[in-house]
Amino acid sequence: MTNKTSRVQPAGPGAQMQIQIQRRGRLRIASLAAVFSVFALYLAWHASNDPDEQREASVTAVFAQDASQGGAAFASPGLVKRGEYLARAGDCIACHTSDRSRPFAGGLPIDTPFGTIYTPNITPDPDTGIGRWTDADFLRAMHEGIGKGGERLYPAFPYAEYTRVTEGDVLAIRAYLNTLVPVHYTPPRNDLKFPFNQRWLMLFWNLFNFTEGRFVPDPKASAQWNRGAYLVQGLAHCEECHTPRNFTQGLKTSERFAGATQAGWHAFNITSDKTSGIGNWSDADMVSYLSAGVVPGRAGAAGPMAEVVADSTQYLSTEDLRSVAIYMRSVPAISGGEVRRRDTWGQPANDVISLRGTKISGVNGAQLFVANCATCHHWTGQGIGASAPGAYPSLIHNSTVGAVTANNLAMVILHGVNRTTKTADVLMPSFAGELTDDQVAAITNYVTKQFGNPQSSVTVDQVAKLRVAQQ
């Protein structure tokens, strides 16, 4: 049948032309599909949820409020204060500040393999910011991912989550932004190669990964649960880092909060699984972690999460943090295959005596640890004053050291820790300038073997890639 069909000749010139048209149509479709597939890879590169005021009172309930109260020209002090709190919850300052002397003025470069995105100015400057935006413009950007000029926004701006935020809350944020000092600053233009500079292609990404619509409270759940769900799914956009990506670089809805790696840092599993996730954490543990960035003897925030704590979650009310904890406890458990909890590994070192007086080898992990790390973490790895929030933490029973992947440990050695909260200032210096890739790998592998998960390790090549991942 196939052979006979292949020998059939067109009836005439018209039929030949029809075949050519069909072939061209198929080629166009295939080309468009190829462009979309390549473009989808770009979408994996999201802005960091990075980055001081007193902690604000709890905001209003989850349910939608009258959008008319958000008019910028008539914003009340209460509305502005509420908007500031919500802007903290959304960590707006993180991506929209490249220079602390001009907060919210944008210009933060987001480097990708396909070029660089620069975040926009969202101060009320009429020429370079959003001073000429109407409330409708702002709502459309937050809820639909469409800018004032009708351009489609890149999902580095998490409109896929912000679409769930009520109109009242969006307009409260708008009212707060209108009170900022206008900064006349034009961020650099995006430098993206074709076809990644074609914003209209976002239409296809949205078809697969975006559903517009506000948060709908679950009438069967408690007010606290609904409040936590509203924050986590909306303004806090936790899934952007903690949920793996599908082939289009949208979120894998079947693996929500199961953990993912971005820019070298691994955002851990935060489902209710008692081994792989945080199902064994108490509400007090979660509140402590989000407000102070640390659960003594268990976990400490570093990298992008440390910045989220410093610039966002530490300012949320205790009531809201408890609501987040209640909601996260209900997230379905997803196992990552771990046999033990990350915070149950390790034992104190006892080899320091044999190392005293010996010549330091450039790649001996134990010797390098004693020389570079023991002053703060003690040669036993048990830390100094490790029970206090701002102390030098123990490496034993430490969730970073006990993780299946050693990425975060190597990243901390390379890039350090800088976390400022109302509880304490935590600073660990970067060793990127002092240690070579093989030395960082040696220390990392010694620490995981002695104080953490002995099955976790990094290679020199992996360290080399991690070294530039956050630069």
Model feature map: region roles:
Residues 1-17:
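N-terminal intrinsically disordered, acidic low-complexity segments at the extreme N-terminus
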Residues 74-97:
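Mature N-terminal segment immediately following signal peptide/propeptide cleavage
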Residues 53-72, 97-117, 148-229, 233-234, ...:
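Flexible coil segments in periplasmic/lumen-exposed cytochrome c-class electron-transfer proteins
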Residues 40-54:
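Membrane-interface motif at the C-terminal end of an N-terminal transmembrane signal
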Residues 290, 380, 396-439:
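Extended, polar beta-sheet/loop recognition surfaces of beta-rich domains
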Residues 19-34:
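N-terminal Sec-pathway targeting helices
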Residues 361-405, 411:
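C-terminal structural cap/anchor segments
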Residues 91-94, 109-120, 124-164, 168, ...:
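The feature marks the first
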